Amino acid sequence: MQLNTRQARIFKLANLLGTGKPVSAADIITSLECSEPTLTRALKELRESYSAEIKYSKAGHSYHLVNPGQLDKKTLRRMNEALAQNAELKTGESTGKVVLDKDKKTAVSLSLRMRILRKIDRLAALSGSTRSEAVEKLALHSVDELIKEYSAKKS
């Protein structure tokens, strides 16, 4: 099962605090790669979801799991296994790039006879595309042909 970012963060936090020793806030933030407000939300979720009692020490600027609630050794082990599986899934994923850039298009106004417009609409219907896509295909094909024709005449 693949974990979402929030789940992975909470599982990591549970494992960090599961040792029973105080853990500094800086170490937790570094390990979870998150901000202080995000850490606060993750601690709240851990307290609420697992009935865990987590104390904050101002002197040491650290957190300590005082009462684990439902975070017993078995639950922590399962969380650790889920994190390991999640890490394996992430390394196995393809690292191909996705390009989300669109071709830059410019709106063009054309004055066409109805006969030509009906032919363009028919081409769009036959090719399963929009009128704009049909005009683009038509223009691309025709312009390429005309360029070849005029290039041949000049040579």
UniProtKB/Swiss-Prot annotation:
InterPro entries listed in its UniProt record: TerW (IPR011233), WH-like_DNA-bd_sf (IPR036388)
Expression induction or repression: Expression is not influenced by the presence of potassium tellurite or hydrogen peroxide.
Gene Ontology annotations of biological process type: response to tellurium ion
Gene3D superfamilies found in the cross-reference section: Winged helix-like DNA-binding domain superfamily/Winged helix DNA-binding domain
Keywords on record: DNA-binding, Plasmid, Tellurium resistance, Transcription, Transcription regulation
Function of the protein: Involved in tellurite resistance. TerW binds specifically to the potential promoter region of the terZABCDE operon and probably regulates expression of the genes.
Protein name (record): Probable tellurium resistance transcriptional regulator TerW
Organism: Escherichia coli
Taxonomic classification: Bacteria, Pseudomonadati, Pseudomonadota, Gammaproteobacteria, Enterobacterales
Gene that specifies this protein: terW
